[in-house]
Amino acid sequence: ARRFQSGFAAGISGDPEDTEKHPWDMFELSKHPDNLLRFVDDDIPGLTTPWVYCGMLFATFCWHVEDHYLASVNYAHKGSAKTWYGIPGSDAEKFEAIAKTAVPSLFKENPDKLHHITMLVPPGQLIENKIKIVKLVQKPGDFVVTFPRAYHSGFSHGFNVGEAVNFAPVDWIEMGRVACRNYVKGNGKRNAVFAHDRVVVTAAKSLKKIFETTKSRGKWMAHMSRVLRTDLETLADELENWQSILNGKQRGDGFIKGDPLRFYKCQNIPEMDGPEDCCVVCKAMPFAAVVRCECEFGRSFARCLQHWNRGCDCKQRHRMVEMRMEVDELRALAKSLEL
């Protein structure tokens, strides 16, 4: 769509010369005040900007969830219908367990097979295993919305043209945090495509600025404030815990032996996140704190706190933690959003 524009690009009148945006233009969705993806300072096709695509008879999209467990909206512009199957996010883990038992040999060879978007499990088999599943037929002019972590699959009845993009309402944040934790465990289908923590921090700073300049406290602000504060406190707690572990003050999971890691304050936080900001081990994208090493490889590539001792063979004393935000900063930002 970035190259050919949205299917709604002709504007309200349908005249190509009409510059007034159609109210359903999916490029406009990324700018909506309630869409947290507007804080992602990158053009990510299909995620922050829509994809326009064509289907054909029996063209299939296998079971999958969206990146970062985001919500999505899909519009059928023209052509034949499309059948969809959906599973609510509440049954996502149950579905994953059933999928692994359906073809155990495939998962033995490739544990993250489900995330390659190449697997179909018959709806009847899912129903037999008490998994909630819904079906719909999308016709031209119909919108289909998928909710965070809702697995979905389907197929086209013939040639058709559709358009889709992701979006992130404020209620997505909690599920986005779950996605981050699963990425760190190696349960993501590919690299994280943006830094969840950067989005939350940027959104919180934006809301704080609105509070300071307008003194407004609308209902939507109260809800957003509450959700952002909760996630910021969660991030601060996790960061504080890992600081305690990596400086040798706390025993437990990840406890280090020998010299504690060095911590230093990052003076120039990158304005955007790129592939080099992904953890070289799990492909998650840390933001508040990044582990580096003095070696050439370690200076160029990041590690998340959970994988501080992976990625190169250097001695522990050469590892250091680049602090982009301190625990106190995160807690102060959260407190500034109190109503």
Indicate residue ranges for each PLM-predicted region:
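Conserved N-terminal structural segment that caps and organizes enzyme catalytic cores in eukaryotes
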Residues: 1-143, 147-339
